[in-house]
């Protein structure tokens, strides 16, 4: 094995963030593209040091452009002498979001069935920057701007077990670096033709906006945006913890009332988060910015003031010192 800069980056990053992964069973999601193939090759090279038990998972959307990819990935797994698991979509996903949702569901199913506590994907620093821009231009709060955390829980694997974790270990490595690595290692990359179609918004960000920003504003824009995400993630986590603790002191036992007199003494940033948590406990739909602002406007409003109807068929009304959620459905 030729030790490279990417081997060092990944090894050191895992030591710093995920030292508990020593000896773990890891399911590696492989699409056949350069990022996931780079991840697979690096993990395979580091297996002796980390004592991992690796396996390859591939999710076949069964799109016409995907013909042959599953066989290619299975061949890669055989070349590495690793177990291979595949899931085929029963209904062809019609959108990027639907395909992404199905992939995570399929990966979770494989991990549960085959007893893998960790799933790894090849998302890179470039993906993180693109997701931040995508969320920013469509409108998003600081929570949405976190854009790809290092780790998240996929699904509870059972009451007596820990959750299956999705880990993205390449978030400090750019797509340029994974491409160069695959060329240097002479890895057989499957080029996804859909990545070139500019009808997809994410592809336009990747193929047009990012290159423009690199050329005219900052050659290191991907790294800068990814660092912004890292800062936002830490700040959002802190604000969520603080607002959650305050929410528990302001809400009544029925979870339908909030003390607006005490809420008025909190900073606006915390008021918005507390109100969002309040609405999430009262209705199934997540509130949007306008709905939260309606309720912010009630904090110091006269008694009996109320919002217009909310998506969950409810309203929020001022009743004395409290904001009360009232369901109006049948």
Swiss-Prot record:
Catalytic activity: cytidine(34) in tRNA(Ile2) + L-lysine + ATP = lysidine(34) in tRNA(Ile2) + AMP + diphosphate + H(+)
SUPFAM superfamilies, sorted: Adenine nucleotide alpha hydrolases-like, MesJ substrate recognition domain-like
Gene Ontology MF terms: ATP binding; tRNA(Ile)-lysidine synthase activity
EC number(s) stated in the UniProt entry for this protein: 6.3.4.19
UniProt binding sites for ATP: 31-36
One term under GO cellular component: cytoplasm
Keyword tags: ATP-binding, Cytoplasm, Ligase, Nucleotide-binding, tRNA processing
The keyword ATP-binding is annotated on this UniProt entry: yes
Gene3D superfamilies: 1.20.59.20, HUPs (3.40.50.620)
Disulfide linkage: none
Keyword ATP-binding included in the entry's annotation: yes
GO biological process: tRNA modification
Pfam family, one: ATP_bind_3
Residues making up the signal peptide according to the UniProt record: none
Domain notes: The N-terminal region contains the highly conserved SGGXDS motif, predicted to be a P-loop motif involved in ATP binding.
PANTHER family cross-referenced by the UniProt entry: TRNA(ILE)-LYSIDINE SYNTHASE-RELATED (PTHR43033:SF1)
Family that this chain belongs to: Belongs to the tRNA(Ile)-lysidine synthase family.
Function, as annotated: Ligates lysine onto the cytidine present at position 34 of the AUA codon-specific tRNA(Ile) that contains the anticodon CAU, in an ATP-dependent manner. Cytidine is converted to lysidine, thus changing the amino acid specificity of the tRNA from methionine to isoleucine.
Protein name: tRNA(Ile)-lysidine synthase
């Amino acid at each position: 094995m030729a030790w490279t800069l990417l081997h060092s980056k990944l090894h050191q990053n895992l030591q710093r963030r995920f030292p508990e992964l020593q000896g773990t069973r890891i399911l590696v999601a492989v699409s056949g593209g350069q990022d996931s193939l780079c991840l697979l090759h690096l993990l395979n090279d580091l297996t002796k040091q980390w004592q991992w038990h690796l396996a390859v998972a591939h999710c076949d959307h069964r799109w016409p452009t995907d013909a042959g990819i599953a066989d290619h990935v299975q061949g890669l797994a055989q070349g590495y002498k690793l177990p291979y698991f595949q899931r085929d979509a029963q209904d062809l996903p019609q959108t990027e979001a639907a395909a992404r949702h199905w992939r995570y569901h399929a990966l979770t199913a494989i991990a549960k069935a085959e007893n893998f506590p960790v799933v790894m994907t090849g998302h890179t620093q470039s993906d993180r920057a693109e997701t931040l821009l995508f969320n920013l231009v469509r409108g998003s709060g600081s929570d949405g701007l976190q854009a790809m955390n290092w780790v998240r829980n996929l699904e509870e694997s059972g009451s007596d077990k820990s959750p299956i974790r999705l880990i993205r270990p390449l978030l400090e490595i750019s797509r340029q670096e994974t491409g160069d690595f695959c060329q240097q290692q002479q890895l057989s990359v499957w080029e996804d033709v859909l990545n070139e179609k500019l009808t997809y918004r994410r592809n336009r960000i990747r193929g047009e906006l990012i290159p423009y920003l690199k050329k005219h504003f900052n050659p290191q824009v991907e790294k800068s945006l990814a660092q912004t995400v890292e800062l936002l993630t830490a700040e959002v986590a802190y604000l969520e913890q603080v607002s959650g603790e305050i929410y528990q002191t302001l809400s009544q036992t029925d979870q339908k009332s909030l003390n607006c007199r005490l809420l008025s003494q909190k900073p606006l940033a915390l008021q918005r988060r507390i109100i969002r948590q309040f609405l999430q406990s009262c209705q199934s739909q997540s509130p949007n910015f306008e709905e939260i602002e309606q309720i912010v406007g009630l904090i110091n409003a006269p008694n009996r003031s109320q919002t217009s109807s909310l998506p969950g068929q409810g309203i929020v009304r001022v009743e004395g010192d409290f904001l009360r959620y009232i369901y109006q459905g049948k």
